[in-house]
Amino acid sequence: MAKDVKFGIDARKQMMDGVNVLANAVRVTLGPKGRNVVIDKSFGAPTITKDGVSVAKEIELENKFENMGAQLVREVASRTNDVAGDGTTTATVLAQSILQEGMKSVAAGMNPMDLKRGIDKAVRAAVEQIHLLSTPADDSKAIAQVGSISANSDTKIGELIAQAMEKVGKQGVITVEEGSSFEDTLEVVEGMQFDRGYISPYFANKQDSLTAEFENPYILLVDKKISNIREIVPLLEQVMQQSKPLLIIAEDVENEALATLVVNNMRGGLKTCAVKAPGFGDRRKAMLEDIATLTGGTVISEEIGLSLETATLEQLGTAKKVTVGKENTVIVDGAGNSADIENRVESIKRQVEESTSDYDKEKLQERMAKLAGGVAVIKVGAATETEMKEKKDRVDDALHATRAAVEEGVVPGGGVALVRAMNALSELRGDNDDQNAGINILRRAMEAPLRQIVTNSGEEASVVVNEVKSGTGNYGYNAASGEYGDMLEMGILDPAKVARSALENAASVAGLMLTTEVMITDLPQGDDGMAGMGGAGGMGGMGGMGGMM
């Protein structure tokens, strides 16, 4: 296929045009008074959003060179969102500003490689300064404030996230779901819950709720199907002597074994309940091991030389309470050794760090939370489906931002942290004038988020930026109320991780784009096909045939 190739200034100009289209669409959403963006959908009602990354993901441009520029800046937003969960709009504004200043310098004849080196040097100094500015986000109040700001000043969402973290721990799993009412609610599932219910409804001993509830039961964990009752008779007799109920978690319980257990249950003999093990394949084995660690039991597996016929009570787990429903099983207060549980959690945490798949990471984090003791579900309420989608996006953002705040602490929000980090660049010098120009490019760009927040709130950006720069520490501008003051005291915080990631990612992609000299894209199919017909142009001479008449 034939290619279209552009060089130098022409290539960079078209790329910059694409950057401006995307960045100008995204930047209007920044800050507490950011504007809405309406996105048309091929089906259903248009989406209304103030979420920068949602806007960026929708933009595809017709001109392929411009589109390349737009997609590279979209990469900045997506990467920042993946790492920190927020700060996408800030990163986009920073990238656009670095590029605009940088392109002017390149056009003036400066060396793009030295400009990039200067920018990189400045980023390292600014990131160190951001770390020095950060304070730990230990208490619920700080967590609630971060959540509220990320959810576009919705204090209810911030408070719900803080409550959820209090209930399930800062490393616990918190999920966001669509609710069925107008109100936002928080539900916490205590203990370990997995999505498998009883194999037969005849195991239910609470007819009003159709659940099987056991106090202090034994828990048998098996990684194969049980179909022959004779395999488990010796163990059932041992359990019977203890007068305790038995929960069986196996790959499956079927045929004669299932029938015998059900009949025994209905006659009031040994109280039992059989449940299929959660997950599939290797994940099933891992989850059985998790349950074994939580309950202090051992998985009966032929792979390690254990068989059901020789199983003893010591190999069974126990828990304070077990509730088995049609679709879920909850094990509360397992009798496992707390040191073993902590080691298991640490082991899973290492797997999360090594995993490259988002799906695997999510599943590993769920397992970790279940071991740690609970899952919190924030149910988002709204009047319409459009509002529901927009709100759910905001809650997801807020949740990611609060996690980032817990990891690396918080810094003053509203663009102030970046303005203060500029101080680290005032004495910084490069190896030559072009590198110094790169340092100055970043210094000017670091004002851009504050300028945009002020512009979106309808005030004069230059006046506010000069006032903020004249102050020190946490002194900044509250765009929501139009007041100056201590940003931390006013509850305007950003996670340090968000500010750091936005700056690093924006500078990284902008540096690559500044040093771009050639752009290559496919020619449209029509152009390519017509190129071979160029010889037909000679037929224009047929106009002379008019003289033959």
UniProtKB/Swiss-Prot annotation:
Residues binding ATP: 29-32, 50, 86-90, 414, 478-480, 494
Keyword Nucleotide-binding: yes
Subunit annotation: Forms a cylinder of 14 subunits composed of two heptameric rings stacked back-to-back. Interacts with the co-chaperonin GroES.
Enzyme class: isomerase
GO biological process, any: protein refolding
Function statement: Together with its co-chaperonin GroES, plays an essential role in assisting protein folding. The GroEL-GroES system forms a nano-cage that allows encapsulation of the non-native substrate proteins and provides a physical environment optimized to promote and accelerate protein folding.
Gene name of this polypeptide: groEL
Species this protein is from: Psychrobacter cryohalolentis (strain ATCC BAA-1226 / DSM 17306 / VKM B-2378 / K5)
Protein name per Swiss-Prot or TrEMBL: Chaperonin GroEL
Lineage, uppermost ranks: Bacteria, Pseudomonadati, Pseudomonadota, Gammaproteobacteria, Moraxellales
Enzyme Commission number, as recorded: 5.6.1.7
Reactions this protein catalyses: ATP + H2O + a folded polypeptide = ADP + phosphate + an unfolded polypeptide
Cited InterPro entries: Chaperonin_Cpn60_CS, Cpn60/GroEL, Cpn60/GroEL/TCP-1, GroEL-like_apical_dom_sf, GROEL-like_equatorial_sf, TCP-1-like_intermed_sf
